[in-house]
Structure formats: structure tokens, C-alpha cells
């Protein structure tokens, strides 16, 4: 096999390199290579991703509740990358949602999206619904397909800008952004004029990562993004100069803090700074 040939070549090159090395260094390199190969095999053995399986559980529970309330069986899932989007589409289609998933991104140029667009053009041929602008019409075709045929839309940030999905009352942040303004914009895709049900927001947070938990705590408790009335966070979000600045501060914590104590101290400092800024801005606007 090609992999066996590659392995033999690698071993031969390694032997040539090791000839001029101190035996202790050579042994250390061999140990590191063995460790890397072990990680490689472990990665290959991963078949079912825990996070994706938990998504199935969340969808099942929330769809069941929506059915009781009379809400549509619709879910908008946000991811940070096209790669994750493609993976989730395949995973969901292989686990009970075949033909019920539509992707929405910056290009909408995959085969399924093209097929949906062609059917949409045929359906509305000669009507004013077709604007003649391909990008806009293709987006509208996917939104219409989500409304009438699909149950799940997997969207990236750039793709979902400006679309109205008030017929969907379940939003899943599969990948959580650090920018609080981006989170509110996501929720705003569903929570807008014409929405007849409370919008349920499901957030995926790695509970084993202390920094991730503190980020969620800030977003939830200081920015009021996930509880209470939509729009109640406007005053708080308005106190920020830029959500990007907030992201930069979080990124600095992730890059520089290693221990839980360091993370705790850094987040306490950031929280204190935010409280001062928020209170001052609210005071200035009164």
C-alpha cells in the first residue's frame, strides 16, 4: 500500500539523520515519533463525535417541545466554518434528517443549493419574486426551501446576514463566537417581527474548559444575551466601543493564561472593567 511505502521511506530517512546524532537525542526523537503516531491512530479511531451526538439530543428534545406548543419543526444552526457546516450536514443526514437539511453560506454554490435554486426559478418563472440578481435570488430560494421543505438550516456567519427567519424558533450556537454583538445578530435572524413563539437558544459550551465557561458566563450574565426579553441587552451592548475589542481581550486571555488561577484572575479583571464601562455609559445616557 502507498502508506507502507511512505512509512519505509520515512524510516530510511530517519536512519540517515540519526547516524550523526547523539544516541540520547536519537532516542528522544524516536519516542516523540512514536507518540505522534499513537495520536494519529487515536484520531483515526474517532468515529462518533460527542458534540454532534449531543446536537441530535438537543434537536430531538426541542422539536418535541415545539410540537406540543404548535411551533414549526425548524432549527437554525450556526457554525464558524464551512468545514464544520459540511460535516454536520453529512452527520445529520445520516442520523434521521436525510433530505431535511439545507446549508447557507457566503457562496451557496454546492450541488444541493444549485438544485434548489433551479427548482425555485422554475416554480416562480415569470413572477416578480425573481429579482434577476443571482446572489439575492439564490439566498431567497434557500430560505423558501427551509420554510417549506427542510427542517434544519446550517448557516455560517457571513451567509446569514440580512435574512429573515421568523418562522424558525430554535437557534443553535454550535460554535460560540466571542463577540456579543454577533450573538445578538444571530438571535435576531429568528427573533424579529412576525415571530409567534419564544425563540429557544441552545449554546454548546465545553464544560471541561474553564475559560470557555467564563466566556459564557460573561455573555449570559453581563450582556443578558440568553435570558429575559430580546433587546434588553441593547443598553449593555451599546456601552461597548466594539465587539471586536472584546474579542481581542478574550483572545489575549486564551493566549497568555495557562492555569485556572491565571484564567480566574484575568476574567475577574475583565468583568470588573466591563462593569465600570457599562455603568458609566448607562449613567451618561440618562
Model segments located where?
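Short, small-residue-biased leader/transition segments that mark boundaries at the very start
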Residues: 1-6
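A short beta-strand element within the Helicase C-terminal
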Residues: 164-175, 200-203
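Conserved helicase motor "Helicase C" RecA-like lobe of SF1/SF2 P-loop NTPases
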Residues: 82-105
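SF2 helicase motor core recognition
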Residues: 143, 154-168, 188-193
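Conserved SF2 helicase motif VI
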Residues: 179-197, 201
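Conserved interdomain hinge at the start of the Helicase C-terminal
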Residues: 47-75, 79-80, 87
